[in-house]
């Protein structure tokens, strides 16, 4: 019998760095296997799950732009990096016999399906894990914004933000400020007004306008994805 989850449908946002582990670059096989096991465990519950991965472990568009590259070109390279991460995660999930589909905003039919909203929803209804890659297909938009947009499009109940270096939202960087306070609950407007670096302001505003809650937690602790889906109080919950 499937375990009961708090949410019917969730979007899990993973930074590229979360897949790199301590090295901060590339794909750590141990980390991606752990993430895949956690996602597969959720997929067996009565919860539909879509995943969005960043590409910062391979390439950051902003870094390229800062070094003098054309911003559009640099961002498209970042989108391709997310596809590499998505395929790696898909492979790990399928090794666990978890039915998975990668949908990309930039068509590359030899390796993934093109993103079509109704197709994505149908895959979720069939209890397949859906991995969204290549951002929204346009430069200047982050994968945080992708997570917000896709969550709205597939009518997800919540965005789960798995972080690799922090276990929630703090008033300041806990690595720098020993007096930093961890929030258990925030509103979207608080997050924007206080300049808390949970996600970029475009994504934050979109979540606020569309009443999409966020749960920010550490991805590095085994079982946290399931705990979040079950409704356990972990990390920081951000609501309207």
From Swiss-Prot:
Q: Which HAMAP family match?
A: PyrH_B
User: Primary place of residence?
Assistant: cytoplasm
Record's function text: Catalyzes the reversible phosphorylation of UMP to UDP.
Give the main EC class. Answer: transferase
Compartments where found: Cytoplasm
> How does it associate, per the subunit comment?
Homohexamer.
EC assignment: the record states 2.7.4.22
Q: Does the keyword Hydrolase apply?
A: no
Pathway in which this enzyme or protein is active: Pyrimidine metabolism; CTP biosynthesis via de novo pathway; UDP from UMP (UMPK route): step 1/1
Q: Which organism is it from?
A: Staphylococcus haemolyticus (strain JCSC1435)
One annotated GO molecular function is: UMP kinase activity
- Return the protein name: Uridylate kinase
Which GO BP terms, alphabetically? 'de novo' CTP biosynthetic process; UDP biosynthetic process
Q: How is its activity regulated?
A: Allosterically activated by GTP. Inhibited by UTP.
The entry marks the following residues as binding UMP, namely 55, 75, 136-143
* UniProt entry keywords in alphabetical sequence: Allosteric enzyme, ATP-binding, Cytoplasm, Kinase, Nucleotide-binding, Pyrimidine biosynthesis, Transferase
Q: Which family does it belong to?
A: Belongs to the UMP kinase family.
Q: Which CDD domains match?
A: AAK_UMPK-PyrH-Ec
Renumbered residue ranges of the record's region Involved in allosteric activation by GTP: 21-26
Which residues does the record give as ATP binding sites? 13-16, 56, 60, 164, 170, 173
Q: Which reaction does it catalyse?
A: UMP + ATP = UDP + ADP
* GO CC annotation terms, alphabetical: cytoplasm
Classification via InterPro entries: AceGlu_kinase-like_sf, Asp/Glu/Uridylate_kinase, Uridylate_kinase, Uridylate_kinase_bac
